[in-house]
Amino acid sequence: MLDKVKNVIVVLSGKGGVGKSTVSTQLALALRQTGHKVGLLDIDLCGPSVPYLLGLEGSDIFQCDEGWVPIYTDESQTLAVMSIGFLLKNRTDPVIWRGPKKTMMIRQFLTDVKWDELDYLIIDTPPGTSDEHITVMECLREVPCNGAIIVTTPQGVALDDVRKEITFCKKTGIKLLGIVENMSGFVCPHCTSCTNIFSSNGGVELAKYAQIPHLGTLPIDPRVGVLAGTTASVLDELPDSTTAEVLRGLVQHLDSITLTA
């Protein structure tokens, strides 16, 4: 049930392992930290990371007359979370389902969760372009989906997959809000200097190619990794970091193009 949700943002990636779930989680925390009521929906059925990233593993979800009740991370209920990870007994349990069952579960996540009034719903999707993505796009045609943010790394093989993701979005009619380049350089945890490990600026060039905004470049920062398993926002814990700067800019960009009043 998305009738109380003002804005829906889908987070996509062309391939796995690019940090999409970390970006989704920290974006949700940054939006909450700046005063918004936020929902985070993890529909990466085969690799749900959000419960681990927020330290919510082992949480039980319940049903009410209106559907599933999400897990809230705080007493003020400013961040609500739903993930298939809450339905698994163990984090290592595989989800061995055929396409139709995955499709049914995604539809349930998008229609049967009792979200209260939200300024933003962030949807963390599986990597690639598959049946799951088609199901998401079909369901979101009935609600005001603002568009998609694509997360990539600067390497050529990742960028090739992102080109497919861009084509997929155009063919399914979802607006592209921009590209975030992740893992661009390594931040030394001692001196905070940044050293390139892979190639750089691939996301910038791809944004130019696709004529969509480049929303920021994030380095590999071990200090951010330490926050995994907590509900701590980079904006609070590392306010002077490059990651915090990019997230603040991303929040401002979303606020400028969405309805949050």
Curated annotation (Swiss-Prot):
Cofactor annotation remark:
Binds 4 [4Fe-4S] clusters per heterotetramer. Contains two stable clusters in the N-termini of Nubp1 and two labile, bridging clusters between subunits of the Nubp1-Nubp2 heterotetramer.
What UniProt keywords apply to this chain's record, in alphabetical order? 4Fe-4S, ATP-binding, Cytoplasm, Iron, Iron-sulfur, Metal-binding, Nucleotide-binding
**Which residues are noted in the entry as ATP-binding?**
14-21
The residues the record assigns to binding [4Fe-4S] cluster are 188, 191
The cross-references to CDD domains, in alphabetical order and at most eight, read:
Mrp_NBP35
Its main subcellular localisation, reduced to a broad class, is: cytoplasm
Which compartments does it reside in?
Cytoplasm
Q: Which GO terms describe its biological process?
A: iron-sulfur cluster assembly
Q: Indicate whether Nucleotide-binding appears among the record's keywords.
A: yes
| Swiss-Prot/TrEMBL cofactor(s) | [4Fe-4S] cluster
What are its GO cellular component terms?
cytosol
Q: List the disulfide bonds.
A: none
Q: Which GO terms describe its molecular function?
A: 4 iron, 4 sulfur cluster binding; ATP binding; ATP-dependent FeS chaperone activity; metal ion binding
Superkingdom field: Eukaryota
The record's annotation in HAMAP family points to: Mrp_NBP35, NUBP2
Q: So what family is this one in?
A: Belongs to the Mrp/NBP35 ATP-binding proteins family. NUBP2/CFD1 subfamily.
Give the multimer and partner information.
Answer: Heterotetramer of 2 Nubp1 and 2 Nubp2 chains.
PANTHER family noted in UniProt: CYTOSOLIC FE-S CLUSTER ASSEMBLY FACTOR NUBP2, NUCLEOTIDE-BINDING PROTEIN NBP35 YEAST -RELATED
Q: What is this protein called?
A: Cytosolic Fe-S cluster assembly factor Nubp2 homolog
State the organism of origin: Drosophila ananassae (Fruit fly)
Name of the coding gene: Nubp2
